[in-house]
């Protein structure tokens, strides 16, 4: 059974139109400083790899803090398309300059639906459409804002999120157990 819904652009469901991160150098991780989210910290599946966590010492970093319902996208290089939907359980982060932030409007869509949509084959096929041969294409904020997104009804979005969240939460617990066992 095919779901009824509508196609929208990312810009249609966001509060902002895509904001580039802070252009600052990373420094060794210091819990007294703000954690710095870089492209290299984001895995292809949208989870974080903080084994080489860094901080940022720039006083302007406060203006680049991720907030609930924010999603960031990698815009360049072999990581183009990687994305991370901010989860406060991961800690506080300022996002780096090679990331583009969009703030999802919860009045228009279940923001976590967008998190999962941006891990779908539909999303990754859209990203791949910018590739040229073996080179991943760059995607700027304007292009990301035009990204097509299929929106089922809010009820269906909530149902999809409920299922995906239960799987994500289980993976998160398993990863913590694995980290504990390998420590």
PLM regions and their residue ranges:
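Sequence-specific dsDNA recognition surfaces
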Residues: 7-26, 35, 40-71, 86
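Non-catalytic DNA-recognition/assembly elements of restriction-modification systems
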Residues: 1-20, 146-183
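Short amphipathic beta-strand starts and helix->beta connectors
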Residues: 86-87, 130-133
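Short coil/turn segments at secondary-structure boundaries
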Residues: 23-31, 129-131
């Amino acid at each position: 059974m095919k779901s009824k819904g509508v196609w929208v652009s990312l810009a249609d469901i966001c509060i902002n139109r895509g904001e580039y991160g802070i252009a600052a150098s990373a420094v060794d991780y210091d819990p007294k400083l703000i954690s710095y989210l870089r492209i290299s910290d984001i895995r292809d599946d949208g989870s974080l790899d903080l084994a080489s966590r860094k901080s940022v010492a720039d006083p302007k970093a406060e203006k680049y803090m991720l907030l609930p319902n924010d999603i960031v996208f990698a815009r360049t290089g072999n990581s183009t398309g990687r994305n991370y939907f901010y989860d406060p359980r991961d800690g506080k982060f300022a996002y780096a300059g090679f990331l583009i932030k969009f703030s999802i409007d919860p009045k228009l869509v279940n923001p976590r639906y967008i998190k999962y949509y941006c891990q779908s084959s539909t999303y990754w096929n859209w990203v791949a459409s910018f590739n040229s041969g073996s080179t991943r294409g760059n995607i700027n904020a304007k292009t990301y804002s035009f990204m097509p997104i299929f929106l089922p009804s809010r009820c269906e979005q909530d149902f999809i999120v409920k299922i995906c969240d239960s799987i994500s939460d289980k993976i998160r617990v398993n990863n913590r157990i694995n980290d504990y066992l390998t420590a």
